[in-house]
């Protein structure tokens, strides 16, 4: 204890307190102390406050609120409510939203952009309240009208359309996490995000937004467009009511589209840049449905606004209703002119007998349906005129197709990128009219895969890069047109948003659709295939567009819709994908072969 005593004295001289520690080898952790004003008997007091504190349970830490984008940028504390008090004081309450947080890898495809909320912004309701009433109120308020609901009202058909967000429908928001150096890439990514976000909201609320209409009789979910279902073959399918898309009280799909454009787009007030020859007016007045004449008389720009093609009910099963000069009856009635019994071969051409017309004659019994024999298999001989320059293959008004016929013109005259945004927007609008909510969600999920790939490929692209990509597209298409003319296989070329860019003569004979009928307006590949094929289209697109696949891919189901109503051509379709320099899908070449 002598060593301990001397230690006490030394410590006591320094701080006025004598601290005692037991000799080495002791296992006790108890600290004792002698105070200078202790009792004379040298009572030792034990300090157990430190040991008690170490064994007490720590208080639960309060959850930290997620800061808004403004407070997060300034590294300031934020509140849970929105808008927060700091943003209200600064007058920026309309931008007070939760800051985007880093997501796990498996959540990359889910949208991270929050919906704006704030006291100064228009009230769009919670996700379960966004419905036809809010969209109708906003649109009618812009035109100084009272809210109303009519048969042709666009809000009755698209309850949660893009119009629920009138501030910036497709422009990238200021608080968006991904910044693009190109406006074209910005716009395209924004519309993809809008499609996924709105359809995810619709998926949660599709039972809420349905309501009873007093003025119309709704058959329930929107029926399929000219699909090969049981309704197609029923006797009622030939009635005047079924004209392509399902209509309510003889309202055609283009009538609804026409009502939308007449109210909200000022393009009807301006004459479009393209001419309107009599032949084209005659064709589109028939192929655009019951309201085709009104659409053409309004002088709407068919390149900027989408009106779907509606198959026509042909009584005689021919395409004479859209031919300037009807076919010669002596040729069409003579079976020897389109069928050779010796070699089991049919003859089709673009002049008086296309493949849909031949199929109608076979199905109706006017021509004997033959099968493979021991010597000859059933075949079809296609007669096409040689490329003599009389046909129109390029047009400066076709921004979506081949504009120029020489490489020099392409590199010199193309000085702006092609915007895929209107195509995606009108594609979603068209699919909403044609398919049920369940199908839409499945299609949009396939389209959602494109967003993270699109970010990775195009986030560093500039406006000059996008212009160069369009030049590459035009130059590649010009070269492919020369190849396609020599191949002789029915071929269609379309962009990544599904917009048709080119069709060859063989496809005209196979489907019955003329090149000018598909390219003189905004047309999508999904317009000319049936419902089951459209579902397969998006699955196939998701398989090849986002993966490193070289070569070709085959659609499991492909049925072409023809201009003749209820006439469907079953085909095998092979896809060939062409990518641009950044890895994005540049164009898709589809080769179609009929199944006899």
From Swiss-Prot:
Give the DNA-binding residues. Answer: 68-96
Query: Which keywords has UniProt assigned to this entry?
Result: Activator, DNA-binding, Gluconeogenesis, Metal-binding, Nucleus, Transcription, Transcription regulation, Zinc
Q: Which residues form the PAS domain?
A: 476-548
User: Which coarse location class describes where this protein primarily resides?
Assistant: nucleus
Regions crossing the membrane: none
Q: Where is this region: Disordered?
A: 1-59, 209-260
- Which subcellular locations apply to this protein? Nucleus
Give start-end positions of Polar residues composition bias.
1-42, 244-260
Q: Pfam families of this UniProt entry?
A: PAS_13 (PF24990), Zn_clus (PF00172)
Sorted alphabetically, the Gene Ontology BP terms of this entry are: carbon catabolite activation of transcription; carbon catabolite repression of transcription; cellular response to starvation; gluconeogenesis; positive regulation of gluconeogenesis; positive regulation of transcription by RNA polymerase II
Which segments show compositional bias classed as Low complexity?
43-55, 224-243
Q: Which is a Gene Ontology cellular component entry for this protein?
A: nucleus
The function of this protein is: Transcription factor which regulates nonfermentable carbon utilization. Activator of gluconeogenetic genes.
Q: Which family does it belong to?
A: Belongs to the ERT1/acuK family.
* PANTHER family linked: TRANSCRIPTION ACTIVATOR OF GLUCONEOGENESIS ERT1 (PTHR47659:SF1), ZN(II)2CYS6 TRANSCRIPTION FACTOR (EUROFUNG)-RELATED (PTHR47659)
- What is this protein's record name? Transcription activator of gluconeogenesis ERT1
Tell me what organism the protein belongs to. Candida glabrata (strain ATCC 2001 / BCRC 20586 / JCM 3761 / NBRC 0622 / NRRL Y-65 / CBS 138) (Yeast)
